[in-house]
Amino acid sequence: MNPHTNLNNVFDFPDLPMLLPKSEALSVTTDFSVPPVQQGAQQFHPPRNLGPQLARRWSCGDSQHADEPPASYYHNLGVALHNHFQMSNQHYLSDFDCPTTVSPISSAHETGQLPQLSPYDHIGNQDPHMFSPHAYGNSMIPDNSYFENASRSISAPNVGNSTLNPSLMSSDNAQSCGGRRRFRTNFTELQSTFLEDSFKESHYPDHKAKKYMADFLKIPEDRITVWFQNRRAKWRRKEHRQRDRTRNESFSGGSNSFDFACFSAQHPDDGPNAKHPNSFGIPNQPMSLDQFPMNTEQDFPEFPSLQEHQ
């Protein structure tokens, strides 16, 4: 027996008889006569079983037909492609521990009959750097470096992988994660005192004054500009609060000093004819109309006319 014979392929055993179904093995007799074949017409030849011949030529090392693979090649190739398509769906789950799919026929990879498959064969002629591995499954998220864009997006966390990616922790990414990063300057006591004194002199220093303060305090000029902006905002808030507090105090003080005695109700014991001593010592007596005589004829004093003055 040939040592290269594949036991899984029946075509590598040409000595075994090819069993045909009984319906095909029985000879059928026909009563009608077959018409003669016309000269020049295309004749139909039934296909022959070339499996044993191809297998024999492949196993015997016939150089003339060496480019004709056996039938086991196509079987192994189909199984390998099926496994490859299953693994391509899990290719981007690089952060998870995915079990690799093993081919049921081990001779497919050991004998070297299958070509080496690239992990990007299922993508086509696209750039392999277009899609980056993502931690949340086969979502096929495009990488920003493929589009040659200066802006970078926030990278997803590494799920299932305890080791951090050092490229994600770079200073470039740390500054771009939050968009525009805000820097906070810590001023010393001397610098704060100097700036407060300058603010008392002028709330809006000019460019020359800010440049002098920057050179004296060893602080960038833009930091001094930001400090004055924040200080003016703080001063305005303080002024608004003080103005509101003063308005509230004046309103509450005026309402407490107001005398509501004039609006007090009359005492129930006081009758309409009650007599109360007043501050002048004159007793209150009921008045009658006879005490006020009505004079119908009154003598008005004569005022000098304008002609006398003239």
From Swiss-Prot:
<keyword id="KW-0805">Transcription regulation</keyword>
<dbReference type="GO" id="GO:0005634">
    <property type="term" value="C:nucleus"/>
</dbReference>
<dbReference type="GO" id="GO:0042995">
    <property type="term" value="C:cell projection"/>
</dbReference>
<dbReference type="GO" id="GO:0030154">
    <property type="term" value="P:cell differentiation"/>
</dbReference>
<keyword id="KW-0221">Differentiation</keyword>
<keyword id="KW-0371">Homeobox</keyword>
<dbReference type="InterPro" id="IPR009057">
    <property type="entry name" value="Homeodomain-like_sf"/>
</dbReference>
<dbReference type="GO" id="GO:0030424">
    <property type="term" value="C:axon"/>
</dbReference>
<feature type="region of interest" description="Disordered">
    <location>
        <begin position="262"/>
        <end position="310"/>
    </location>
</feature>
<dbReference type="GO" id="GO:2000748">
    <property type="term" value="P:positive regulation of defecation rhythm"/>
</dbReference>
<keyword id="KW-0804">Transcription</keyword>
<feature type="compositionally biased region" description="Polar residues">
    <location>
        <begin position="281"/>
        <end position="298"/>
    </location>
</feature>
<dbReference type="GO" id="GO:0005737">
    <property type="term" value="C:cytoplasm"/>
</dbReference>
<dbReference type="GO" id="GO:0000981">
    <property type="term" value="F:DNA-binding transcription factor activity, RNA polymerase II-specific"/>
</dbReference>
<comment type="function">
    <text>Transcriptional regulator which plays a role in the expulsion step of defecation by controlling enteric muscle-specific expression of exp-1 which is required for enteric muscle contraction. Not required for exp-1 expression in the PDA neuron. Also involved in controlling the length of the defecation cycle.</text>
</comment>
<protein>
    <recommendedName>
        <fullName>Homeobox protein dsc-1</fullName>
    </recommendedName>
</protein>
<dbReference type="InterPro" id="IPR050649">
    <property type="entry name" value="Paired_Homeobox_TFs"/>
</dbReference>
<dbReference type="InterPro" id="IPR017970">
    <property type="entry name" value="Homeobox_CS"/>
</dbReference>
<dbReference type="InterPro" id="IPR001356">
    <property type="entry name" value="HD"/>
</dbReference>
<dbReference type="GO" id="GO:0006357">
    <property type="term" value="P:regulation of transcription by RNA polymerase II"/>
</dbReference>
<dbReference type="GO" id="GO:0000977">
    <property type="term" value="F:RNA polymerase II transcription regulatory region sequence-specific DNA binding"/>
</dbReference>
<keyword id="KW-0238">DNA-binding</keyword>
<keyword id="KW-0539">Nucleus</keyword>
<dbReference type="Pfam" id="PF00046">
    <property type="entry name" value="Homeodomain"/>
</dbReference>
<keyword id="KW-0963">Cytoplasm</keyword>
<feature type="DNA-binding region" description="Homeobox">
    <location>
        <begin position="180"/>
        <end position="239"/>
    </location>
</feature>
<keyword id="KW-0966">Cell projection</keyword>
<dbReference type="GO" id="GO:0006355">
    <property type="term" value="P:regulation of DNA-templated transcription"/>
</dbReference>
